[in-house]
Amino acid sequence: MRPLILLSNDDGYSAPGLTAVRDELARHADVVVCAPAVNQSATSHSLSLHRVLRLLEAAPGVFAVDGTPADCIYVALHAGTRVLPRRPDLVVSGMNHGLNLGADIFYSGTVAAAREGALRGVPSIALSADAGASLPAAAALGVKLALALHRAAGQEGRRPAPLLNVNIPAGSSWPVRATRMGARLYTEEVIFRRDPRGHEYLWIGGAGVRHDLVPGSDTEAYDAGAVSVTPLTLDLFAAQHEGIAGLLAAELNDGPIP
């Protein structure tokens, strides 16, 4: 039986990156797309709990949800056979138009879709490519990595489900590195403007980017022109701060903190 792969993204169900990955995956697996109806970049792992959602079958095996990437994976995995004929063997998110390096993973809808899959026990991989990358080459490499993850996860029966974040730099041929999260720092800005009626509005974010040196990191790999494959954890417990939590608990148990 061919593996069943659930494919999503945050750029929208008709995005070129998703189409390229879908076409490449379809050579090796059965693919069902469940992706946002419109661009949902930087929506992180939000779920739409306070409004109705719409599910549209845009084409056979291609579903659009008017919600976030995490909504899409949630709907696909919990809607019975409305979307998927059975439980998928793998969740693939991407190919994202743009990178998700370092702390980008906390904002990325692409990574969040994969994370939602892993939270539900399905091996998952997020794929992102630099705007200067050859999309056919990036899709081919991303699919090779996705299928390798499927084989490795199936053989080892890993629990919890593995979650990988892949970033592909500009170009069409790359070495591949196993990496850790790096440090990607942006020029933070709040830009205020006024509309034609005199009402104030603002834009947040900044265009300038620099990478701090973190040996063995995804940012280091990107700067060297290599593909980064970064395993992510669903357990956010910070052992290095366990002592602080213990101190606060002890002080509260002994009496109010002065």
Swiss-Prot record:
GO cellular component terms, alphabetically, are: cytoplasm
Q: Where in the cell is it found?
A: Cytoplasm
Residues noted as binding a divalent metal cation in the record, renumbered to the chain: D10, D11, S41, N96
Cofactor dependency: a divalent metal cation
According to the record, cofactor stoichiometry and binding are noted as: Binds 1 divalent metal cation per subunit.
Q: Which domain of life is it from?
A: Bacteria
Q: InterPro entries from the entry?
A: SurE (IPR030048), SurE-like_Pase/nucleotidase (IPR002828), SurE-like_sf (IPR036523)
Signal sequence coordinates: none
Q: Name one GO molecular function term.
A: exopolyphosphatase activity
In UniProt terms, what function does this protein have?
Answer: Nucleotidase that shows phosphatase activity on nucleoside 5'-monophosphates.
- What NCBIfam families does the record point to? surE
Family assignment from sequence similarity: Belongs to the SurE nucleotidase family.
Any idea what this protein is called?
5'-nucleotidase SurE
Species whose genome carries this gene: Sorangium cellulosum (strain So ce56)
Q: Which gene encodes it?
A: surE
